[in-house]
């Protein structure tokens, strides 16, 4: 992976990565990866929270969108960023989201 100063991560994504760690060594690996590739962790703002709640109302039933993914999508939209994820099912239907899906 090429280093760049243009990498952003929702605080929600960061917390999900840490949550999946099995031990402190894996926590350190996640933190070191985020730091070494210059990711900027974006906070949850009032606007992100509001937009995420709208996404839940609109997309939770038809696409199964959950709160964490709504926060991630809202963070991307509020910061005018393209969201890149393999979670195509939950994100592809969000109309105002710039989304690029991939298969791992």
Regions found by a protein language model. Name each.
Residues 1-63, 67-81, 98:
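PIN-domain endoribonuclease scaffold, especially VapC-family toxins
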Residues 82, 89:
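Flexible glycine-rich beta->alpha loop in the catalytic core of nucleotide-sugar glycosyltransferases
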Residues 16, 90-91:
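Short, active-site-adjacent cap segments at secondary-structure transitions
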Residues 21, 95, 103:
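Short, flexible helix/strand-to-coil boundary loops that buttress conserved ligand/catalytic motifs
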Residues 10, 65-66, 87-88, 103-104:
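Histidine- and aromatic-rich ligand-binding microenvironments
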């Amino acid at each position: 992976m090429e280093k760049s100063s243009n990498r952003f991560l929702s605080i929600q994504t960061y917390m999900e990565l840490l949550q999946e760690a099995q031990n402190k060594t894996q926590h350190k690996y996640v933190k070191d990866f985020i730091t070494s590739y210059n990711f900027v962790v974006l906070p949850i703002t009032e606007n992100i929270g509001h937009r995420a709640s709208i996404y839940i109302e609109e997309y939770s039933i038809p696409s199964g969108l959950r709160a964490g993914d709504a926060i991630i999508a809202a963070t991307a939209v509020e910061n005018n960023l393209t969201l890149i994820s393999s979670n195509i099912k939950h994100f592809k239907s969000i109309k105002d989201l710039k989304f690029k899906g991939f298969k791992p």
